[in-house]
């Protein structure tokens, strides 16, 4: 199976590393998963016989530009690569844009037009125009998978749509942002104020340099929109979510909650057609009371009742785990 990776930051490099590490396993159980092109904002590296993935990672880390890949590197836009390079699947992992969805939206739609399946970790297009993307994929007869867009390594979307097939999902609640969960955990355990806990999260690389989307709840809002649309058949956008972040939470509030048998968590919730992201009181003994950077999602269903999945919600290798699962699904659906 021939693959184009669009976007070669932390997640793109994570996919390359996982495909390299798993190459023997994939060849033995499926077939060779060959990366024939990698693009970033500088250009591309293209080899129809398959790029050397360790070399690609080394070039990117040393020079910052994939176009510097020896002999196979060139100045070429991602759109032109999608149009001109023969491949089965495009893995779209450019940074998420929650305002317009681009460039990822354009990359995905262009892939569909060129009869290429798509796997993405990109929240932007999914949170803004999910219905359009699904309809375009169907129109062009290609598969569109996006497990990695919510919850990193946690199999949330595929669990609900495949393992729980036949169940009606009545509600979804969860902690879907590791940065905010880490900050609240530090505030609770060590009595730190919000600013100190945020500073520590930045120093450890857990929080982004600009953590606004995380701490204001926008990242979680995008994720629950994706879950509402993909699992519960809604047609929501990020504008439909009532959002409140964690910046006003104090260690005193956490202390008082603890005294009463509760903690405070940033919860994303889909229930009765409403989408909410806000700090909520969670019982200490609740499955939703996970610590540190862990994520958790709880489904309320008509048949299986409550189903809970917990896991690492971020990280290049964890996200690559979900992308690999989607790639294998596409192989099983098209190549067998």
Swiss-Prot record:
Pathway: Amino-acid biosynthesis; L-methionine biosynthesis via de novo pathway; L-homoserine from L-aspartate: step 3/3; Amino-acid biosynthesis; L-threonine biosynthesis; L-threonine from L-aspartate: step 3/5
Protein name: Homoserine dehydrogenase
Active-site residues, as the UniProt record annotates them: 223 (proton donor)
Binding sites annotated in the UniProt record for NAD(+): 10-11, 94, 315
Entry's Gene Ontology BP terms: methionine biosynthetic process; threonine biosynthetic process
Cofactors: a metal cation
Family the entry assigns: Belongs to the homoserine dehydrogenase family.
Positions contributing to Na(+) binding: 147, 150, 152
Catalytic activity: L-homoserine + NADP(+) = L-aspartate 4-semialdehyde + NADPH + H(+); L-homoserine + NAD(+) = L-aspartate 4-semialdehyde + NADH + H(+)
Pfam families hit by this protein: Homoserine_dh, NAD_binding_3
InterPro entries from the UniProt entry: Asp/hSer_DH_NAD-bd, HDH_cat, HDH_CS, HDH_short, NAD(P)-bd_dom_sf
Xref: Gene3D superfamilies: Dihydrodipicolinate Reductase, domain 2, NAD(P)-binding Rossmann-like Domain
Role this protein plays: Catalyzes the conversion of L-aspartate-beta-semialdehyde (L-Asa) to L-homoserine (L-Hse), the third step in the biosynthesis of threonine and methionine from aspartate.
EC number from the UniProt entry: 1.1.1.3
Binding-site list for NADP(+): 11, 94, 123, 205, 208, 315
């Amino acid at each position: 199976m021939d693959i184009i990776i669009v976007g070669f930051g932390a997640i793109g490099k994570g996919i390359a590393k996982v495909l390299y590490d798993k190459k023997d396993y994939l060849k033995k159980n499926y077939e060779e998963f060959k990366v024939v092109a990698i693009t970033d904002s500088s250009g591309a590296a293209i080899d129809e016989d398959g790029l050397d993935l360790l070399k690609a990672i080394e070039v990117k880390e040393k020079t910052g530009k994939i176009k510097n890949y020896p002999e196979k590197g060139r100045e070429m836009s991602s759109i032109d690569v999608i149009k001109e390079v023969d491949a089965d699947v495009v893995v779209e992992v450019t940074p998420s844009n929650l305002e317009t969805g681009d460039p990822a939206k354009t990359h995905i739609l262009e892939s569909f037009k060129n009869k290429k399946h798509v796997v993405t970790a990109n929240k932007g297009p999914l949170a803004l125009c999910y219905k359009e993307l699904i309809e375009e994929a169907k129109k062009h007869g290609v598969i569109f998978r996006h497990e990695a867009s919510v919850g990193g390594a946690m199999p949330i979307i595929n669990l609900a749509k495949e393992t729980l097939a036949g169940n009606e999902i009545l509600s979804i609640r969860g902690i879907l942002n590791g940065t905010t969960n880490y900050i609240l955990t530090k505030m609770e355990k060590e009595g730190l104020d919000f600013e100190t806990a945020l500073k520590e999260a930045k120093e450890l690389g857990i929080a982004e340099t600009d953590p606004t989307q995380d701490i204001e709840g926008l990242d979680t809002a995008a994720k629950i929109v994706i879950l509402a649309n993909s699992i519960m058949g809604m047609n929501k956008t990020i504008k439909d979510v009532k959002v409140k972040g964690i910046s006003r939470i104090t260690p005193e509030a956490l202390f008082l909650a603890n005294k009463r048998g509760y903690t405070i968590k940033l919860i994303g919730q889909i229930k009765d057609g409403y989408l909410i992201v806000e700090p909520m009181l969670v019982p200490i003994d609740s499955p939703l009371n996970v610590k540190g950077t862990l994520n958790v999602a709880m489904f309320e269903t008509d048949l299986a009742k409550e189903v809970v999945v917990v896991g690492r919600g971020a990280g290049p290798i964890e996200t690559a785990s979900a992308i690999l699962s989607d790639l294998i699904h596409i192989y099983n659906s098209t190549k067998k």
